[in-house]
Amino acid sequence: MADVLRQTSAPNVMVHEIALSDHEGKADLLTPQGEQGAVHGLASIEPQLVLSAKSCAIQSVPTARLDEVIREEVAFVKIDVEGHELSVLHGAVGLLERSQPVFLVEAENRHRASATESVFEFFHEREYSGFFVEDGDIVPVEQFDAGIFQDESSLLPDGGRKRGRAYVNNFFFFPSGKDGWAVLSS
């Protein structure tokens, strides 16, 4: 995948072959194997996430903290790490305090128990406001109910959405002083 990204990305994109976390070291990247082969979109270094898969490919990967990988100012961070969100965020506290970027975080309670609540609390403690988009409406994370917005019966076996069914797993977080509502409304 890294080679494909290098070949297809803009010249200013740097590809790092690492797993972000809250520590430096190594971790096992577990990639579930489906009937059609590897399900890369569900690969994770969170072992409990993929235990339900019949089989997994295991690859040892280096881990690093985002604070050590990116020292430049950044305006936007996207996190999609299949259950490892809180660890990545704890490894990015310096970047968050230094740059105060906007974050887009994918979090699902099916990947890690209370994943959404712990991510919401992490940002609340740092005076960030959070929002999600549901059926075209911008909604504060305080109104998020996983029982409604992350009903697993809305999902296909590969994690895709069933036609006509809503499932919310992307959340925007804005630092104090930045009007997230206005940004998302524009």
Task: Annotate each language-model stretch with its function.
Residues 1-186:
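Phosphate/nucleotide-binding beta-alpha loop and adjacent structural elements of enzyme active sites
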